[in-house]
Curated annotation (Swiss-Prot):
Region Tail, subdomain A, annotated ranges: 391-435
Biased composition (Basic and acidic residues): 451-462, 526-544
Lineage: Eukaryota, Metazoa, Chordata, Craniata, Vertebrata
Protein name: Neurofilament light polypeptide
Keyword Zinc-finger: no
Subcellular location: Cell projection, Axon; Cytoplasm, Cytoskeleton
A GO CC annotation given for this chain: intermediate filament
Biased composition (Acidic residues): 463-525
Length: 544
């Protein structure tokens, strides 16, 4: 006869065919409050041990059992089986939750490692920021030097233009002085021309007076001559009348000749003086006219040059004003650019400080997360140890119950963890003698790990400069602690297996008092583990 048993913990859900014999399952109403997991290996070994023990030790006693006892046992076995399934499903769900929690923590750890890598890259980036800042400063300095060079060039140009302006002003002053001299000479020439004109008018008047005098003298001479002629005629008549009168004609002719010579001489001298004076006045007038014309030409040329120089001066003034405005604009622009660059420098420095503070905050958060991770790893290791100890205890107690529980002829199958007469699993379960010491060792390890984590948290409050080194060292220490924890767990498992093999026979012979004492010890160990877990959770909440 074969029956199908369903194992829900295989990866592909399978049904196995097991040769069934009259098996007696063990009743237990205990529901473990501790966090345990189901191991397929333990399940298969327990089932095999149940099969072998039932096939070897229960076959002779089947004939002596009543059908009512068999029915009661089968109903009890069904109840125990359903309870076991419920417990195993609960443990499986809890184990799956633990695995999901571990995966979630691993994902968070990866995310935190990526963030740490980014933060380290950002921490290494200030050199590039410094290069960018120095490049920007160099560009600003080059621009400032170029602006200073342009400013110096403009200043030199301004000085050159100022020198040219001073030269032009000097020439303008010289031209003004020469103009004043020319105007003064022109005034003198005008005065001389006026004097020459007055002298000419005077000479003309004098010439008119002399001509009138000559005419008057001619008239007087003619009258005298006529008188003399009349007198001569009268004298001749009288002489003729008076027969012996003197001859006056020769004397008159002599006087007339003398007067004519004197008149001709005076006329010639007057004409010569008039001609010489007229020539002198004509030459002086012509000379003054040439001087006036030259002065007028020079004055017009001076006026033209003065207007040209005035235009040049105005142009130079406009250029000077434009250059001054350009210099002022360049100075304003440079001051604005320098202020902008200074603002950019201040902004970059502020960003650098913010980045450093943010990086320190990220490092602090990463340190806290590392501490939380280490605490969670410690808690997981503690739970793992508790689960492994529970599985070991269950396996050993199951084996001891099967080997030593059915030695009596009565339906009472011995005092084991799955005794049919036990009403509560908490009061009648039998533990190995070494399990209490094993739990105490685990509690000591947990306390040592907690102390080490506290010490590391105290070290985490070092200055910001040592945070990276401390984080790396703690990361390495965490890995070494995990490796040591795994090695210690493996060693403890090996020791547990060896001690379990040696003490399998002793477990069946232990009394009810020892089982209760060991149960109390296990309860104390579990309570200590729960207290340690609660302390860790409180620490996590405080840190958060």
């Amino acid at each position: 006869m074969s029956s199908y048993s369903y194992d829900p913990y295989y990866t592909p859900y399978k049904r196995r065919v097991v040769e069934s014999s009259p098996r007696v399952h063990i009743r237990s109403s205990y529901v473990s409050p501790s966090r345990t997991t189901y191991s397929p290996l333990v399940s298969t070994t327990m089932r095999r041990s149940y099969a072998t023990s039932s096939s070897s030790s229960f076959l002779p006693s089947v004939d002596t059992m009543d059908l009512s006892q068999v029915a009661a046992i089968s109903s009890d076995l069904k109840i125990v089986r359903t309870q076991e399934k419920v417990q195993l499903q609960d443990l499986n769900d809890r184990f799956a939750n633990f695995i999901e929690r571990v995966h979630e923590l691993e994902q968070r750890n990866k995310v935190l490692e990526a963030e740490l890598l980014l933060l380290r890259q950002k921490h290494n980036e200030p050199s590039r920021l410094r290069d960018m800042y120095e490049k920007e400063v160099r560009d600003v300095r080059l621009a400032q030097e170029e602006a200073s060079g342009d400013r110096q060039t403009l200043r030199n140009e301004r000085e050159r233009l100022e020198d040219a302006l001073r030269v032009l002003q000097g020439r303008y002053e010289e031209e003004a002085m020469s103009r004043e001299d020319s105007e003064a000479r022109l005034l003198d020439v005008r005065k001389e021309a006026d004097m020459a004109a007055l002298a000419r008018v005077e000479l003309e008047k004098r010439m008119d007076s002399l001509l009138d005098e000559i005419a008057f003298l001619k008239k007087v001479h003619e009258e005298e001559l006529s008188q003399l002629q009349s007198q001569v005629q009268y004298a001749q008549v009288s002489l003729e009348v008076e027969v012996a009168k003197p001859d006056l004609s020769s004397a008159l002719r002599d006087i007339r000749g003398q007067y004519e010579k004197l008149a001709a001489k005076n006329m010639q001298s007057a004409e010569e003086w008039f001609k010489s004076r007229f020539t002198v006045l004509t030459q002086s007038a012509a000379r003054n006219t040439d001087a006036v014309r030259a002065a007028k030409d020079e004055m017009s040329e001076s006026r033209r040059m003065l207007s040209a120089k005035g235009l040049e001066i105005e142009a130079c003034r406009g250029v000077n004003e434009a250059l001054q405005r350009q210099i002022q604009e360049l100075e304003d622009k440079q001051s604005g650019e320098i202020a902008g660059m200074q603002d950019a420098i201040n902004k970059l420095e502020e960003e650098l400080r913010n980045t450093k503070s943010e990086m320190a905050r990220y490092l602090k958060e990463y340190q806290d997360l590392l501490n939380v991770k280490m605490a969670l790893d410690i808690e997981i290791a503690a739970y793992r140890k508790l689960l492994e100890g529970e599985e070991t205890r269950l396996s050993f107690s199951g084996v001891g119950a099967i080997t030593s529980g059915y030695t009596q002829s009565a339906p009472v199958f011995g005092r084991s963890a799955y005794s049919l007469q036990s009403s509560s699993y908490m009061t009648s379960r039998a533990f190995p003698t070494y399990y209490s010491s094993h739990v105490q060792e685990e509690q000591l390890d947990i306390e040592e790990t907690i102390e080490s984590s506290r010490a590391e948290e105290a070290k985490a409050e070092a200055p910001e400069e040592e945070e990276e080194e401390a984080a790396e060292e703690e990361g390495e220490g965490g890995e070494e602690a995990e490796e040591e924890g795994e090695e210690g767990e493996e060693a403890k498992e090996e020791e547990a297996e060896e001690e379990g093999g040696q003490e399998k026979e002793e477990e069946g012979e232990e009394g009810e008092g020892e089982a209760e004492a060991e149960g109390d010890g296990e309860e104390e160990g579990e309570s200590k583990g729960d207290e340690a877990a609660e302390e860790e959770s409180e620490k996590k909440e405080k840190k958060k």
